[in-house]
A protein has these predicted regions:
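Metal-dependent phosphoesterase signature
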Residues: 1-20
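PRPP/pyrophosphate-binding module of the type I phosphoribosyltransferase fold
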Residues: 12-14, 262-352
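Substrate-recognition element of Asp-dependent hydrolases with the DxDx(T/V) motif
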Residues: 13, 22-52, 58-65, 212
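A short, structured active-site edge motif that brings together acidic residues
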Residues: 54-69, 212-216, 244-257
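Conserved Lys-Pro-Asp/Glu-containing loop-to-beta segment of HAD-superfamily phosphomonoesterases
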Residues: 71-93, 292-295
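Acidic, Mg2+-coordinating phosphoryl-transfer loop and its flanking beta/alpha structural elements
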Residues: 88-125
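PRPP-dependent phosphoribosyltransferase catalytic core
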Residues: 126-165, 307-378
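Active-site-facing substrate-recognition patch
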Residues: 135-210, 219-221, 253-285
Length: 378
């Protein structure tokens, strides 16, 4: 169950009059038995009772709400994670309440507040707010797949085999691209469920996390990845610290590699064509050390991308790596133990790495998670 928190400022159209569309959206969400509260440091505004008459929207005066303690107390009382709270954000106080309370912040797109505008999840209007809430509310709150190898972890939001026999990585990748490029409610819901899954696993905000994207096989797409924008938005949702610059990718593809999802490149468990065509960005040689790194990819089958990324990051001194795929095909995921014998921030020759072994990477699955993704990436 999700709860939606807003403040008087986030729904006001003028200084004394709330936006009727936003009010109706909140009432509609609340009347479907979802907790909705207007939270403020100040007493209940004069317009509240009339605006929310005959609805289940409640007003809560929480002095010092910026500390986020209000969210933590309610979460504890009802035995629910703080990541189940969506906080509509239009002011600095809203931002602080949500961040300190370890909730999911959703920017009110009609606000000019700088902190709100910096958030990765933004709704443009009342209709989009409802859509994001409803799509996200269908998500059971966990990864579809969770697996851990001796040297890195793999997470996936959904089982892509459930798309049908004709599904493949190319078509799903295009679906993800379309969803991200089109923006709107589906993108924001996709960001929200990914953020919730991370925060649930972490038990709240985690410090020292570095976010990156596994690069395209095409070197001309230098940081022009659809997933780059998705990852930037995700980072701003679950973390307050930015270790990577939006304009500087973590990995650099210096030479084109075979498009494995299109059947190119032969043995899809052989890392040679990947290891020898990319390297880490030297700009991060110092900042990557000791960090827990999250690598985002659209989908995975054999898991080779994550194995290669883990090898480079281990050589660079990263503390850990978790690969997150929006989807996973089949049951052929493997763990790759790869060691680099050269500088991970420069091109690596085939003679400068060793594939020690690759073995099956088992994990746990949560069946209920996959259906929700079909709504977000149709």
């Amino acid at each position: 169950m999700l709860a939606l928190l807003a403040s008087p400022s986030s729904i006001l159209k003028t200084a004394t009059k709330p936006d009727t569309d936003i009010v109706e959206a909140l009432k509609d969400i609340a009347n479907k038995n979802n907790p909705v509260a207007i939270v403020s440091n100040n007493p209940k505004p004069n317009w509240f009772d009339e605006a929310f008459n005959l609805s289940k929207v409640v007003f809560v005066r929480a002095k010092g709400r910026q500390s986020g303690q209000f969210i933590k107390d309610v979460a504890k009382k009802h035995n629910m994670p703080t990541s189940n709270f969506l906080c509509l954000t239009a002011t600095d106080e809203d931002y602080m309440m949500g961040k300190n309370g370890q909730a999911i912040l959703i920017a009110a797109g009609w606000s000019n507040n700088a902190k709100a505008k910096s958030l990765g999840i933004q709704v443009a209007n009342a209709s989009e707010l409802k859509e994001v809430f409803e799509l996200t509310n269908n998500w059971p709150g966990s990864w579809w797949f969770t697996g851990n190898s001796p040297s890195y972890g793999v997470r996936a939001l959904a089982d892509l085999s459930s798309y049908g026999a004709g599904a493949d990585q190319v078509s799903f990748s295009q679906k993800v691209t379309n969803t991200v490029k089109q923006g709107g409610g589906r993108l924001n819901a996709l960001l929200t469920i990914t953020s919730r899954s991370l925060l649930l696993e972490w038990g709240g905000e985690k410090k020292g996390v570095f976010f990156g994207v596994y690069p395209s096989s095409d070197p001309t797409k230098f940081n022009d990845e659809v997933l780059t924008d998705f990852t930037h938005r995700l980072r701003t949702t679950v973390s307050r610290v930015r270790y990577a610059d939006r304009s500087e990718p973590l990995f650099i593809r210096h030479t084109a590699s075979p498009k494995r999802s299109k059947g190119q490149g032969g043995d899809r468990t052989d890392p040679t064509s990947q290891v020898t065509t990319l390297h880490l960005n030297p700009s991060y040689a110092q900042s990557i050390r000791g960090k827990d790194v999250i690598i985002i990819d659209d989908c995975t089958t054999y898991g080779l991308s994550f194995g290669v990324a883990a090898a480079f990051l281990a050589a660079a001194g990263a503390s850990s790596m978790t690969g997150i795929a929006l989807g996973k095909f089949g049951s052929r995921l493997e763990h790759y133990h790869i060691t680099l014998n050269s500088d991970p921030f420069a091109p690596v020759k085939a003679s400068d790495f060793t594939l020690v072994e690759h073995t099956s990477l088992p994990g746990k699955t949560a069946v209920g998670a996959q259906n929700a993704l079909h709504e977000l990436v149709p």
